[in-house]
Amino acid sequence: MNQATALMAPSDARLKFRNGLVTPTSGWSDGYTQANLIAVAADYADEFIEFCRLNPKACPVIDIIPAGRHESVLAAGSDIRSDVPAYRIWVDGELADEVTDATSVWRDDMVGVLIGCSFTFEAALASEGIPLRHTETGRNVPMYRTNIECTPAGRIHGPMVVSMRPMLPGLVDTAIRVTSEVPKVHGSPVHVGSPEDLGIADINRPDFGDAVEIRPGEVPVFWACGVTPQSAVMASRPSFAISHAPGHMFITDVPESNYREPAGVSL
């Protein structure tokens, strides 16, 4: 882990991304809340927000930026069109482009939704001795589309996406305890063990992000992931949408501790 990026103030990180730095944000600005982004035209916004409400494990909303505004209340002076390291542009449900600044393609009627990200709790996992293989090896976290269908909302539907972190079985209970305290960044895992149970045919071929080594004796642990709205875009095919590129998050000024709740969620 890079100590300089781990200790960087969120505002400084956002400025670097605004100036063109492209990098996954796992390990950046430890202790602060990171967020996934999905932005859609106003005529789809209510349905997307309802989709998130109905699927809070995968899509815990932490801010909604209405049409005509670009600053999140969670980050003073921010601009959600430029302060993410990389964006994906979707046309009719197909990935049309990936850009480092979405200002020129952002439409006046677009509503932005920020969804809590599991990168937020990684420093807490690491402090308990739980490995973060993707961070240790300089890779993006692996993410997979699953056979778990989210609850639909109007025209919006699609399968849950999960992120995966391998660990020894003896650490699983600790991981559950630590992450269950932060439901606004996905909370406790949705599955431990066999990836086939989630419809994942080859764990070494993630749908998003990078594959990581699962060492002898380790088990894969899966958390619901905020790339799920992108899966919904692919399935529902709205005419236009903008998202973060998987693993490249919006870093807020909000301490992770602000979202911490008493533990009590378990598999």
Swiss-Prot record:
Its EC number is 4.2.1.-. Pfam families: D-Glu_cyclase. One of its GO terms (molecular function) is lyase activity. The keyword Lyase applies. Keywords: Lyase. The keyword Lyase applies. InterPro entries: D-Glu_cyclase, Putative_hydro-lyase, UPF0317. Belongs to the D-glutamate cyclase family. This is Putative hydro-lyase Arth_3576.
